[in-house]
């Protein structure tokens, strides 16, 4: 059932002329029915965890991987990574270095030398194997970015999307992330000198925050409920009716009953 056929069904039930088109129709009654249909779609979407609107998203923890091009045998070890963007005091995870493999899998606090070079605090690489090639550095950070940067932009509204609790897992570590934390619990963790033992998360300021800060480059997945309750005939999801050929992702029968109720309530 499309928007057009649903509205035609509604108009027959409420006793007004059925339209041949809805979108762009200038008849005041059809304009009102369309407005009521959009109201009904929004409210239905918020009332239930519809499986048709449930989606899964995966993302990679930490900042973008920065390519390492050189590492010195020195105290402290000096790392070359063009335009790394790091600041003194930042922590980075290093992986995939060839040659100087002793660096791999470890977390380092760094000192910025310049835009392309940083040193690894308290790391004497003088006796390490010689660096040959490759390597990635990732900034260790509690914030995994905005929700909108994690969830596909084409099916997202930060004010309406709902994350499904108890579905967030670190697939690399095969461990759950517990949450979302309350404000009190999260602030308590920030005040504590102890980290762990559980990985936890909180949403704040439209950011996804992890505690403790995860290792960079790991895959995390979770489910969420989209606020897009209809879609175009081509399958593009939407949060409002825009064309006669649009199709509901929620039962149009339920929507039609709701529109009829709204019409009668308004009269």
Where does each model-flagged region fall?
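Glycine-enriched, solvent-exposed interface loops adjoining structured elements
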Residues: 1-67, 136-267
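Small/polar beta-strand repeat architecture
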Residues: 63-151, 216, 224
């Amino acid at each position: 059932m499309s928007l057009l056929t649903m509205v035609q069904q509604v108009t027959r039930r409420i006793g007004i002329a059925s339209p041949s088109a809805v979108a762009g129709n200038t008849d005041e009654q059809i304009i009102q029915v369309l407005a009521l249909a959009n109201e009904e779609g929004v409210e239905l979407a918020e009332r239930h965890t519809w499986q048709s609107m449930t989606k899964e998203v995966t993302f990679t923890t930490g900042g973008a991987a920065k390519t390492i091009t050189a590492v010195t045998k020195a105290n402290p070890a000096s790392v070359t990574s063009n335009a790394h963007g790091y600041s003194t005091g930042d922590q980075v995870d290093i992986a995939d270095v060839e040659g100087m493999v002793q660096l791999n899998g470890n977390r380092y606090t760094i000192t910025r030398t310049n835009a392309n070079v940083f040193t690894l605090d308290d790391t004497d690489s003088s006796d390490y194997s010689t660096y040959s090639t490759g390597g990635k550095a990732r900034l260790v950070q509690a914030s995994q970015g905005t929700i909108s940067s994690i969830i596909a932009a084409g099916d997202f509204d930060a004010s309406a999307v709902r994350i499904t609790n108890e579905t967030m897992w670190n697939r690399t570590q095969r461990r759950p992330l517990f949450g979302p934390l309350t404000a009190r619990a999260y602030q308590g963790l920030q005040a504590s000198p102890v980290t762990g033992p559980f990985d936890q998360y909180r949403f704040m300021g439209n950011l996804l925050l992890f505690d403790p800060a995860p290792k960079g480059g790991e895959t995390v997945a979770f489910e969420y409920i989209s606020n897009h309750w209809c879609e175009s005939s081509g399958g593009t999801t939407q949060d409002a009716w825009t064309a006669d050929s649009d199709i509901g992702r929620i039962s149009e029968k339920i929507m039609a009953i709701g529109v009829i109720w709204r019409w009668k309530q308004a009269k």
